[in-house]
Amino acid sequence: MKIILSVLTVLFLVSCSSTKIVDTWTNQEHLNYKPKKVLIVGVTENLTARRLFESKLKDEFTARGINAVESYNVFKPTFTNAKQTEEEIDEEVKRVSDNGFDSVLISAVKGVDEKVTYSGDAYRTNYYWRRFGRYYYLYQDVYFDRGYYEKYNVYHIEASLYNLKENNDKSLVWVASYDIVDPNTINTTINDYVNAIIKSLEKENIISNK
């Protein structure tokens, strides 16, 4: 939990796109774990984005009979606006746990990759030409067509669920990695990402379907 709360300085991107799950892992020691009161933490400097993400995820948990609260209603502004010491983080974790929270779900950006795609006529990729002349003849149009190269970003985002009552190396219940491609609009991205998280948790039987 110390590590989790200390990543509050990392930017959490919620802004539209295509959301794809990349990987997921569930702690085999928590196969029957069912969260009852969840603190939802969206790591971002953008307060609007944070509120939208946490509120949307809270609504999804509530619809499944799980008590959930947004971190902006729990954390003091001084906690998220400044870097915390380990002692201060421990105190906040204890305060949250003492208030009845048994779980925390936190999401943060782990990295960003810039990609390049070429837009133009389609070329055969399933055949190898054995003569240079034939190869060059067929592909020389790349010099003359109106295709272009376009850059876009892929954001690698991680969501993790922790058991606050453990508060040790075994407290991680579930973690999943997602890729969000070239986000544009905040509302659509948040909806897509939250839905992806919920589907993952349902698949692992951590939460029930509606």
Give residue spans per PLM region.
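Surface-exposed short loop/turn segments
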Residues: 87-160
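Residues that line or immediately flank small-molecule/substrate-binding pockets and catalytic motifs
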Residues: 8, 108-111, 180
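Positively charged n-region of N-terminal signal peptides that target proteins for export
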Residues: 1-5
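N-terminal segment of the mature soluble domain
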Residues: 45-114
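C-terminal/domain-edge helix-coil "capping" segments
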Residues: 17-36, 138-210
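A general structural motif
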Residues: 35-37, 101-102
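C-terminal motif of bacterial Sec signal peptides marking the signal peptidase cleavage site
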Residues: 12-15
